[in-house]
């Protein structure tokens, strides 16, 4: 009977997700007006209390509290809310290497039994403060003081005492102001008030006076509204049928930041709006603020500020003079308002950040260029983990491949249709009743053999492992987790019990490092029976998703390690789960020398150090194909570079044209995976017949040919944090016409891509940037040179608009193979596109494509330079190993935009004279079979 009840409940829950795929049910998810902490903080046009809030929220620096502790490179002072005698805050100001300013604020003397959560494990251990110098010392005669970097001129900070305000100056120009609108808000930790004792019976006269007072209050609508905003939801809060007990009461924080001189801000992924973030308030705009709260949104809508699966609280501002940023280090639910402000002097972007709990911990990234912003953010949170080469190939996924025979047929289908691919994926149905680390023995009786058959072709398999653990005492993971007390607790201290795919489920507390270590051991070959070294992992549902929880997630009053509530750590949960899973893949091998591959849906700042991310449950609609580019660009700006969107759309059934265009777009996005819902029809690349099979094959083959570029660009990210997929303005920061462009993008600094994302598109306009520097672009298909500017092109179905920048040198591998492994020893083709000065340069990175040996110097990082008709090839890094000598050659060199030489000579013995072909129509020179080793320096002269 109990099993029947469970099945009925599961069918109802699943129908909510599987049956309704037209659009997301927004009633299940909160907006600012549903979150009392947001209403209390927000300068709301709905309530109209802006002036009242401003007058109440002034914070002042306490006189005599300012001190510079040189041993700590830190300035301390106390803050006190105006007209308040208690609830002192303490603030710390620091400058870090690279010109990063940090501001932290919390209670000076919090209650002994309560504490605020401070984000752990996101910042790198290597970050260091630098000495601070007074620029203007504090004094009784002045309402301001200022300080600067003690070792170099990059920026300085001006602090106003009454009311508190902090301004960041870059190159002596005001860049970011803090609390200029007096929206600094800090709800002090307090104990819940005890109910008042029963009142004695009042006299008739006292009752009359009380009634008259109540009438007077009711007549004052403004006061009633303000009181409602100020006090509602302090100690409990309801949403739908769910109650949040809020045992710690109100603990929200807020702050405003204005980006001076800016009209464009970017970042704070993940949302479905355009790359340049839209205003949510001011000038008659009535939008919900951007929400940052990781949620399982089973089908999302376009152009919405609602929360999705992962978030990074980083905002970047860019104008023609500077690029700056704010990183708000807080893991609780957060809202961000954006407002355009235009003054006679310059535009500005005002932003208001509100979090439910935690401390104020803000990093000011002072830039002042795009490249320095990326370096500064990477300095704090790290760069992208260098992926294995196979993970940059094509991945084939479906919910679900039904059996070992089904897997075999799909695998053979790629070979029969001559389409390369690297990874086949298994969704939740491969398990024994959604018990992860197990197999459905009826359909997958010999999983190790299945993986070995795939592995014999040098391909990989990925299985899904979600964080919800089926509550079954016969399931070893659950029984051990229960006995060790490893589950998150509910508000009453019992193991949290929620519903997900397995039915009744509990959730491990990954904020506890002991539990993360234990989880990592579950991936050992002795624990994960049937797994092999060819098996990698997919983490889904890790926001976390709880079907019967508030907003399809966990109750905020659930209890975590250290006594913190789930509300404090929510946005870190998926990050920690992703981390523990990746650690498990490393530790399962004795030598611990295999780079992990773990795809995650949830993410936070620092997730780039762990593995790949995808944009979640999109739909087979043209609008979802179109928005995938802005979404991925936003993620790349925030460090999440190894990211992609499900090709074809997860929900629904794309027609042949949409699927083809999506493959073409996905081939030029960092993570390239086809995926589909359980109820979607099969859509393997060959199922739509001709001409679609051929065109899709060509798109995938083109992806594989550019893998040396992708791999090199990912390596360069490990050096400088630069996005792999980047907006045009990153490369051309002074061209204001590019600041809104998000349907074109660059791969590294070399390829410009504008995917076709409109149905029945026959022609389209392409914006080729760089007019101010006389940039030249080359169509990669026709090889014709095109001057920078707007052009109109034909877009037949087989056309992918891709252009190589003049001045770049790209390495390719053009032999078609089954998978990336077979390409390892293939020779390179070098494509040189000359700029208007007849020069070009580029890099090539090579290692063993799978291990951590590159960290020991076992790699080649090579530099190509073409100038004055001379091509030189040399080491681009003094860290390359002199002993690492891959037996790989260069078999062809193509130079575009060059005059025909009389002869070509090389300084390598036996290669002194090289043969060539010349196409005068294209000004194209081809050197065939130079057969030069990639580990050897050489010089080629065009005479």
From Swiss-Prot:
Principal localisation: endoplasmic reticulum
Enzyme Commission identifier(s): 3.2.1.207
Enzyme class: hydrolase
GO cellular component annotations of the record: endoplasmic reticulum; Golgi apparatus; intracellular membrane-bounded organelle
Keyword Endoplasmic reticulum annotated: yes
Compositional bias annotation for Basic and acidic residues: 198-211
Family: Belongs to the glycosyl hydrolase 31 family.
Biological role: Cleaves sequentially the 2 innermost alpha-1,3-linked glucose residues from N-linked oligosaccharides on newly synthesized glycoproteins.
Protein name stated in the entry: Neutral alpha-glucosidase AB
Source species: Dictyostelium discoideum (Social amoeba)
């Amino acid at each position: 009977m109990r099993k029947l009840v469970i099945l009925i409940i599961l069918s109802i829950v699943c129908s909510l997700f599987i049956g309704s795929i037209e659009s997301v049910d927004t009633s299940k998810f909160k907006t600012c007006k549903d979150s009392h902490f947001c209403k209390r903080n927000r300068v709301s046009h709905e309530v109209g209390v802006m002036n009242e809030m401003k007058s109440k929220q002034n914070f002042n620096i306490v006189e005599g509290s300012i001190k510079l502790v040189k041993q700590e490179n830190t300035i301390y002072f106390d803050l006190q809310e105006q007209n308040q005698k208690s609830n002192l805050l303490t603030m710390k100001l620091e400058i870090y290497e690279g010109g990063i300013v940090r501001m932290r604020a919390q209670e000076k003397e919090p209650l002994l039994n309560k504490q605020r959560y401070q984000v752990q494990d996101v910042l790198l251990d290597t970050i260091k403060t630098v000495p601070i110098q007074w620029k203007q010392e504090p004094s009784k005669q002045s309402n301001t003081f200022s300080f600067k970097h003690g070792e170099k001129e990059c920026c300085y900070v001006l602090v106003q005492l009454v009311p508190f305000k902090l301004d960041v100056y870059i190159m002596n120009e005001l860049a970011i102001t803090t609390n200029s609108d007096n929206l600094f808000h800090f709800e002090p930790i307090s104990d819940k008030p005890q109910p008042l004792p029963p009142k004695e019976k009042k006299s008739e006269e006292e009752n009359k006076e009380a009634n008259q007072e109540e009438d007077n209050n009711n007549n004052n609508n403004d006061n009633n509204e303000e009181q409602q905003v100020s006090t509602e939801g302090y100690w409990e809060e309801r949403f739908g049928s769910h109650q949040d007990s809020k045992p710690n009461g109100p603990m929200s924080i807020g702050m405003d930041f204005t980006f001076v001189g800016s009209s464009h801000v970017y970042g704070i992924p993940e949302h479905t709006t355009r790359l340049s973030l839209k205003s949510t308030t001011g000038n008659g705009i009535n939008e919900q603020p951007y929400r940052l709260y990781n949620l399982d949104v089973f089908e999302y809508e376009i152009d919405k500020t609602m929360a999705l699966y992962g978030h990074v609280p980083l905002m970047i501002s860019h104008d023609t003079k500077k690029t700056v940023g704010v990183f708000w280090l807080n893991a609780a639910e957060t809202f961000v308002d954006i407002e355009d402000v235009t003054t006679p002097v310059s535009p500005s972007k005002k932003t208001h950040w509100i979090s439910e709990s935690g401390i104020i911990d803000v990093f000011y990234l002072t830039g002042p260029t795009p490249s320095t912003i990326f370096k500064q953010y990477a300095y704090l949170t790290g760069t992208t983990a260098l992926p294995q080469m196979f993970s940059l190939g094509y991945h084939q996924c479906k919910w679900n491949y039904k059996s070992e025979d089904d897997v075999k047929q799909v695998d053979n289908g790629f070979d029969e249709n001559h389409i390369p691919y690297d990874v086949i994926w298994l969704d939740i149905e491969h398990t024994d009743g959604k018990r992860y680390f197990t197999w459905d023995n009826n359909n997958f009786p010999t999983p190790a053999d299945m993986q070995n058959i795939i592995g014999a072709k040098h391909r990989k398999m990925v299985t899904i492992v979600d964080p919800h653990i089926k509550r079954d005492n016969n399931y070893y993971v659950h029984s051990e987790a229960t006995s060790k007390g490893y589950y998150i607790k509910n508000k009453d201290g019992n193991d949290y019990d929620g519903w997900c795919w397995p039915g009744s489920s509990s959730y491990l507390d990954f904020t506890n490092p002991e539990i993360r270590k234990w989880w990592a051991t579950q991936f050992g070959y002795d624990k994960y029976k049937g797994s092999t070294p060819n098996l990698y992992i997919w983490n889904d549902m890790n926001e976390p998703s709880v079907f019967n929880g508030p907003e399809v997630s966990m109750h905020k009053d659930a209890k975590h390690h250290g006594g913190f509530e789930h509300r404090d750590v929510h946005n870190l949960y998926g990050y920690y789960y992703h981390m523990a899973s990746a650690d498990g893949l490393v530790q399962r091998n004795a030598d611990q020398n295999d780079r992990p591959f773990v795809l995650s849906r949830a993410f936070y700042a620092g997730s780039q150090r762990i593995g790949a991310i995808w944009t979640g449950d999109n739909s087979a609609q043209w609008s979802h194909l179109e928005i995938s580019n802005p979404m991925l660009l936003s993620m790349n700006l925030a460090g999440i570079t190894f990211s992609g969107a499900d090709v074809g759309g997860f929900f629904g059934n794309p027609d042949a044209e949409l699927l083809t265009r999506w493959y073409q777009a996905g081939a030029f996005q960092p993570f390239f995976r086809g995926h589909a819902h359980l109820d979607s029809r099969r859509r393997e690349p060959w199922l739509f017949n001709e001409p679609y099979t051929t065109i899709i094959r060509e798109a995938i083959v083109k992806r594989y040919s550019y893998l040396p570029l992708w791999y090199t660009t990912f390596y360069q990210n490990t050096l400088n944090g630069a996005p792999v997929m980047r907006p045009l303005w990153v490369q051309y920061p002074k061209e204001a016409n590019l600041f809104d462009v998000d349907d074109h993008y660059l791969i590294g600094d070399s390829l410009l891509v504008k995917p076709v994302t409109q149905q029945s598109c026959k022609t389209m306009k392409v914006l080729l940037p760089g007019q101010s520097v006389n940039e030249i672009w080359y169509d990669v298909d026709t090889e014709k040179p095109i001057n920078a500017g707007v052009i109109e092109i034909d877009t037949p179905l087989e056309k992918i608009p891709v252009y190589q920048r003049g001045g770049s040198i790209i390495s390719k591998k053009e032999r078609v193979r089954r998978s990336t492994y077979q390409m390892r020893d293939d020779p390179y083709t070098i494509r040189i596109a000359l700029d208007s000065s007849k020069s070009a340069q580029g890099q090539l990175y090579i290692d063993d494509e799978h291990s951590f040996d590159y960290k020991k110097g076992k790699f080649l990082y090579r530099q190509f330079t073409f100038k004055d008709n001379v091509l030189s090839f040399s080491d681009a890094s003094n860290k390359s190993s002199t002993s690492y000598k891959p037996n790989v050659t260069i078999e062809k060199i193509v130079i575009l935009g060059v005059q025909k030489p009389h002869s070509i000579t090389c300084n390598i013995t036996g290669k002194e004279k090289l043969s060539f072909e010349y196409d005068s129509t294209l000004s194209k020179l081809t050197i065939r079979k130079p057969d030069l080793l990639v580990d050897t320096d050489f010089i080629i002269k065009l005479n």
